[in-house]
Structures are given as C-alpha cells and as structure tokens.
C-alpha cells in the first residue's frame, strides 16, 4: 500500500546543489515539507520573506534516497561531493523550481507517494542584477556561466520530472520514511494510541 505524503519531516541531510549545467539528480522520494522562507539580516537575525501580497514566501524540502545516474553534488555549507547511491539528501525548491514541482505533480496524475522517482537535470542559468531582476538572456552552456563576473549573481535551473516508483526503491524509501517518522512508545502510552500509531502500516 502506498504511503501518502504531507506530514512534517525535518532531518538535516545534505542538500543537492546546482553548480553547473548538465548535472543530473535521480532520487526516490522519502518525504516532502513546505516551510516559510527566511533571510538572515546584517544583525544575524533571520526574518521572514513575504510576497507583494503580504503572504509568506515558501519553499519545498524534498527528502530523497539517491538513485543510480546521479552526478549532481550534495553537501552542507562548503563541504560538497557526489553522493553515493542510497544516501539520504534533500532538494530545496523555491521560486520557479517550486512551481516546476507543482506542475510535475500534476503531470504525475495522482497523489505523490513515498518511493516515487524525481529526476532533475540542470539545463539553463540566469544572471540577476543587485535588485534580483533578470539581466540578459538565459545562459545554456557552462562556458557562458563561467564567463559571468563573480560580482554578479547567477541562478542555475533544472527541468524536473516525477515518475511512479518501482521495486526495491519503494521498499527502501518506505523504510527510510518509517525510521524517520517513528514515534517512541513508553510503558504508560494508552493502548488506543499505540493502535492508532500502527494502523497505517
């Protein structure tokens, strides 16, 4: 039986990076979580980011198991490397990437489940000015990206696709989901609560 996604899930695993055009990530989805975006100010305090209508800007955190075919780096901070097959990593999607995920979910044709496969391949980049507005045309080669002065901000974007999970990767992703969301039980826990916790599995 497939496990529907939507519960809160916040492990601190390495984040998949987009550092060059042509990088591929393939993963089995373990869980997803929406959260409000924040930005650290000059005083070191994080403040919420809001849209023009006053609503909070959001991002999507997708926890995955790395599948074969991945060559995109992952890491936390400056420590990055190509993850091994089976490693747990996170995709952090915001802005256009978040919108692309929503479209990919619609194209999947059903509710996303643990073990479904996400495929991401970086295919373009965009230079932004100091105010965060796009500057010039999208870039499509790494040579163009490398020629951009370091003083300018470059965002690298990817095409994203969701596919139904298959075989052992569903089993592995479901095991990871259960391990991460397990609720410790004590001797004083009410019997009805124990039954409710076990019911979905």
Give the ranges of each region predicted by the language model.
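Hydrophobic beta-strand residues in large extracellular and virion-surface proteins
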Residues: 27-32, 60-66, 89-93, 112-120
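Short nucleic-acid-contacting surface segments enriched for D/E, G, S/T with interspersed K/R
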Residues: 98-121
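Positively charged, low-complexity intrinsically disordered regions
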Residues: 91, 151, 192-194
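Acidic, gly/ser/pro-rich intrinsically disordered tails
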Residues: 1-9, 161-201
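OB-fold/S1-family single-stranded nucleic acid-binding modules
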Residues: 119-182
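OB-fold ssDNA-binding interfaces and closely related basic DNA-contact patches used
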Residues: 1-84
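Short, structured beta-strand/loop micro-motifs enriched in basic residues and often containing a Trp
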Residues: 87-103
């Amino acid at each position: 039986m497939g496990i529907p996604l939507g519960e809160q899930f916040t492990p601190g695993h390495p984040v998949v990076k987009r550092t060059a055009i042509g990088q591929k990530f393939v993963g089995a989805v373990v869980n997803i979580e929406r959260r409000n975006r924040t930005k650290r100010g000059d005083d070191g305090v994080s403040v919420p980011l809001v849209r023009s209508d006053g609503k909070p800007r959001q991002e999507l955190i997708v926890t995955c198991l790395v599948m074969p075919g991945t060559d995109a780096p992952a890491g936390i901070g400056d420590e990055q490397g190509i993850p091994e097959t089976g490693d747990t990593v996170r995709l952090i999607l915001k802005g256009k990437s978040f919108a692309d995920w929503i479209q990919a979910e619609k194209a999947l044709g059903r509710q996303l489940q643990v073990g479904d496969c996400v495929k991401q391949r970086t295919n373009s980049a965009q230079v932004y000015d100091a105010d965060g507005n796009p500057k010039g045309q999208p870039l499509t080669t790494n040579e163009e990206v490398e020629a951009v002065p370091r003083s300018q901000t470059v965002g690298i974007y990817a095409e994203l696709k969701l596919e139904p999970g298959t075989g052992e990767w569903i089993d592995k992703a479901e095991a990871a989901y259960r391990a991460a969301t397990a609720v410790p039980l004590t001797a004083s826990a009410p019997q009805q609560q124990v039954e409710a916790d076990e019911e979905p599995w």
